[in-house]
């Protein structure tokens, strides 16, 4: 994992805006599936080039090969699951803003609407996605072979984020066994990504605290167990080749039900991952002060979100620079990488997303001049 040794590096955390022709093929569903995947090599080559042109240093494939999103993509990569109707719990924030939440993404479903469907575990979980994973790795390797970049990452879901709603596990005796089975299966994906020479990003959003109305004690207990399970799944993988991404969901909502980083940072720092990517926009903008008191362990790198995925407002380069400089003065300039709160693709209009990335590159350049007195 590269450090900001001579300038503030820039990155993001996953999904990027898809080309229009890919979106059109995806909308056609199964009949166009083969054509969609046949178009991926060129689409990945183009998105790698776009990231380089805009000024991103640590890049990925835009997650175009992950049909279903950051977690549901595993429905074709894990055995033991069936797609079935599922009632989801109403979280604390939905109860606090009931009228606002009706019909919104991640909100309360309108009265009379059909239940959503989810991945329901009905049998033993095993990894069956090697062909899909090999395809994604090959596409990204080919794209960066002719377009050198500072570093390359590929994301994979955390074992506790496949389906965490009640009723998802109908096979294993306990939730602990269910999560361990997911971890054992996903460890094949983790290892393949790092064996390819990429940085592994583990997507581990913490919106369960809000969505499941957990108490802080309940959340910390569950998160501590997840860290233990993940560390087991990461056995043999260098911590310097792993980064974790935590956030509070991509919904454009009030986010009053979010945790604060200080409520679980002690547990997060126990993960065998040297990179920590976290949400630091709007409601979380003050959390940089946490590192006045929390000592960043040797080898760890922070990747705060300097771009928000929950608003169309394009952050000013000077604001981005300010966010980077103030944190760098606490933990060391080499230990800070500019990141995003979550994936911008699919949540923001492509024009807005790329404008934000351009602003990030400009802000990182301003921060570099300040921190290196250049």
Short names for language-model regions:
Residues 1-374:
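Domain-level signal for soluble alpha/beta catalytic cores
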């Amino acid at each position: 994992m590269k450090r900001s040794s001579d300038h503030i590096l820039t990155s993001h955390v996953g999904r990027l805006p898809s080309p229009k022709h890919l979106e059109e093929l995806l909308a056609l569903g199964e009949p166009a599936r083969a054509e969609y995947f046949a178009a991926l090599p060129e689409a990945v080559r183009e998105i790698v080039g776009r990231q380089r042109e805009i000024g991103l240093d640590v890049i990925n494939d835009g997650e175009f090969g992950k049909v279903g999103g950051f977690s549901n993509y595993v429905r074709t990569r894990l055995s033991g699951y069936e797609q079935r109707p599922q009632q989801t719990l109403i979280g604390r924030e939905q109860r606090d803003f009931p009228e606002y939440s009706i019909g919104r993404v991640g909100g309360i479903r309108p009265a009379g609407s059909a239940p959503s469907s989810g991945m329901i575990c009905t049998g033993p979980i095993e990894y069956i996605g090697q062909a899909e994973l090999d395809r994604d790795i090959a596409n990204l390797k080919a794209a960066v072979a002719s377009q050198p970049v500072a570093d390359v990452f590929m994301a994979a879901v955390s074992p506790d984020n496949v389906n965490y709603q009640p009723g998802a596990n109908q096979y294993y005796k306990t939730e602990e066994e269910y999560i361990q089975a997911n971890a054992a299966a996903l460890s094949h994906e983790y290892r393949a990504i790092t064996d390819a020479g990429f940085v592994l990003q583990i997507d581990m959003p913490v919106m369960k605290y809000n969505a499941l109305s957990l108490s802080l004690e309940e959340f910390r207990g569950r998160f501590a167990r997840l860290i233990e399970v993940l560390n087991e799944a990461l056995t043999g993988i260098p911590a310097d080749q792993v980064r974790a991404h935590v956030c509070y969901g991509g919904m454009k909502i009030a986010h009053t039900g979010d945790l604060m980083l200080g409520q679980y940072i002690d547990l997060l720092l126990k993960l065998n991952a040297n990179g920590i990517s976290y949400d630091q926009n709007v409601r979380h903008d003050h959390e940089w002060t946490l590192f006045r008191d929390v000592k960043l362990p040797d080898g760890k790198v922070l990747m705060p979100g300097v771009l928000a995925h929950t608003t169309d407002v394009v952050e000013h380069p000077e604001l981005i620079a300010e966010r980077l400089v103030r944190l760098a003065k606490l933990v060391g300039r080499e230990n800070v990488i500019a990141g995003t709160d979550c994936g911008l693709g699919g949540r923001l209009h492509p024009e807005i997303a790329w404008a934000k990335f351009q602003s990030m590159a400009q802000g990182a350049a301003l921060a570099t001049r300040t921190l290196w007195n250049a």
